[in-house]
């Protein structure tokens, strides 16, 4: 049993047993298959904590880990909102939210790429500012990136689910706290928790720090009603030992990472389970 499997199953059980239904509301989300309202059971404010002795990834079903890393590179490295850039990597998870101009509007990578921070008399973006400050001002309590920009929310295809990171440097270790306003526990959570842990490992490597703690906070923590039956099946499955994530140690520049610099070794997992997408 991995740290992730244990915490994940605990949250799923809590939602199924104690979650509050939103069936009294006219919800925004619709089932992609038939256009009917996609309702949820939810609880508020859940936290997952990992000591980074193992990579946090689900083993009761397969997580598309390469796709998760490619999306991470698209947002954090390319700082792109162009879905075509993601398609070139063989990833199509954002196709349903693509606007006429081929982008997802002013969301995700668009916000990270804005040159809105001042550094040595120049304007830089949030990622470059973070990398500089972690190296040169490690004791700061202001190591924060933010994707939730009220000025741009109406211009986004989808407002960000994971919207904030806060980084801490203590005793030579880089700790990361992530905040998600909302998490679909069947599809989004295993993806997001893994990919932001990969981000922590990447940034620790290029800034020269050891890995510290990894914390993932969820505001609206929910399960879609059509996902409940398969989640019950998933929770009863055999759990495996955590795999090892290899990251090419030769990469010292954040912008030089490619998907070929990552390997997930001995990833044992349950069979794929299908969960319908709500849009």
Swiss-Prot record:
Annotated InterPro entries: Thymidate_synth/dCMP_Mease (IPR045097), Thymidate_synth/dCMP_Mease_dom (IPR023451), Thymidate_synth/dCMP_Mease_sf (IPR036926), Thymidylate_synthase (IPR000398), Thymidylate_synthase_AS (IPR020940)
Keyword Transferase among UniProt keywords: yes
GO annotation, biological process: dTMP biosynthetic process; dTTP biosynthetic process; methylation
UniProt keyword terms in alphabetical order: Cytoplasm, Methyltransferase, Nucleotide biosynthesis, Transferase
Keyword Methyltransferase: yes
Pfam families: Thymidylat_synt (PF00303)
Catalytic activity: dUMP + (6R)-5,10-methylene-5,6,7,8-tetrahydrofolate = 7,8-dihydrofolate + dTMP
EC number(s) recorded for this UniProt protein: 2.1.1.45
Active site (record annotation): 161
GO molecular function: thymidylate synthase activity
UniProt pathway annotation: Pyrimidine metabolism; dTTP biosynthesis
Described purpose of this protein according to its UniProt entry: Catalyzes the reductive methylation of 2'-deoxyuridine-5'-monophosphate (dUMP) to 2'-deoxythymidine-5'-monophosphate (dTMP) while utilizing 5,10-methylenetetrahydrofolate (mTHF) as the methyl donor and reductant in the reaction, yielding dihydrofolate (DHF) as a by-product. This enzymatic reaction provides an intracellular de novo source of dTMP, an essential precursor for DNA biosynthesis.
Self-association state and partner proteins as the record states: Homodimer.
Name this protein carries in UniProt: Thymidylate synthase
Source organism: Bacillus subtilis subsp. natto
